[in-house]
Amino acid sequence: KNDPESKGTIALWQNIREFLDEEFPDAAMVSEWGDPQRSLEGGFHMDFLLEFGTSHSNDLFRCKEPYFSSRAKGNIYDFVESYKENCEKTAGKGLMCMFSGNHDVDRLARHLHGDELKVAFAFILSMPGAPFIYYGDEIGMRYVEGLKSVEGGYNRTGSRSPMQWDDST
């Protein structure tokens, strides 16, 4: 709070990184800030291009007509421009990562199906950085509609269900 430029937050995480490097030199710190420039400055080894803000990653996978959907009418240019800008600002400082999902967003399979999912995963897995696959996305796990919100889950609750195994595993 009251740290609009995150200077104090960055200093705190730099201190934690210093300790981590001394005690656990093989460990890696992963941020969920969605702001690689700031988080890498803060000492994290990697950060995501999250679905909010100016990354435009939502345009690829989760908007009304995502880029990787067969019905897509959008373009990839806003994402590419944001990605290039982030690459320039973070070059050599750490990894900027793509993710299939997390506990805060709809499941990928809620918006993409079949070959669309395959192409989206090919994209995620071939981008520079470290790909992050949210549990279940690798088997096309679906968003579970109608689950009761628990502990502030709201519309995210359907992405937080247990692994949906079936007889094919």
Where are these regions (language model features)?
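Conserved alpha/beta catalytic core and glycan-binding cleft of carbohydrate-active enzymes
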Residues: W13, R17-D167
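Aromatic- and acidic-residue-enriched carbohydrate-binding clefts of CAZyme catalytic domains
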Residues: K1-K7
